[in-house]
């Protein structure tokens, strides 16, 4: 009975983790946002892109904080196709519930700016995820020791599990539209994507537990204020079963005079959850950003406002050329 109860608790925590993992800098991990963004909308001097995100949250509430790490590579195959792949790892709390996902991505431009300002792209992803947990990371009722006034993990739990890891097939799809007209001051964009298309069984027991499909709608616009300043309002809506996220934000990019460098400042609000502040720096199409979530939900009473710290790095390069420009020497 204890094993069944623990397994049920694991399934609940697994579902909660899959719904509560956020990337505040979601636009820095485009394949995680929408497979239709794979290998597209590069600048003229860019053929490929490397990006990575790291996030840690709930450090104030859990003995082991929730962590998310992602890494990705994508490139344009020609003027119509983009290909890439990404890996993301989520690890949550006690029991080290871990989900490692690897997906290959592909995109196709149905319409592009060679024929006009309207750009429409579709994309698909396929791959595998591995989900596991460590039963030694939990405590059990028979490990309670009155003499120690707490749990003694050196006492055998007496519990056995048929399996502590599963591998499942994963797939997703998306569509993305962007209006691109360099002579215009506003260039809007919107996308839609669906993840967990096969509704994989994520149960560690013989009882099936299907992962609900995850729906994402995202959009915004690039507004050119002048030659040095750009404002980008954005909105993100995600829904999975009965859980949803609404994220609204505004960021500003300012080009430093007489340089190719830009600095960025942004503020987002995740509905009934967190206020997100982020800063960034861009040089030669490489972007580094750091953000912090200030918790505003009911958990604020326990977290003291401390939410999640996140970093992202995006590197863009051209085939046959160094990824980083050599530093000029001062004579």
Q: Residue locations for each model-derived region?
A:
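Absolute protein N-terminus
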Residues: 1, 18-19
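Positively charged n-region of N-terminal signal peptides that target proteins for export
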Residues: 1-4, 112
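Sec-dependent signal peptide hydrophobic core
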Residues: 5-9
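Short, linear, compositionally biased motifs with a strong N-terminal bias
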Residues: 10-11, 204
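N-terminal signal peptide c-region/cleavage motif recognized by signal peptidases
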Residues: 13-15
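Subset of outer-membrane beta-barrel
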Residues: 19-331
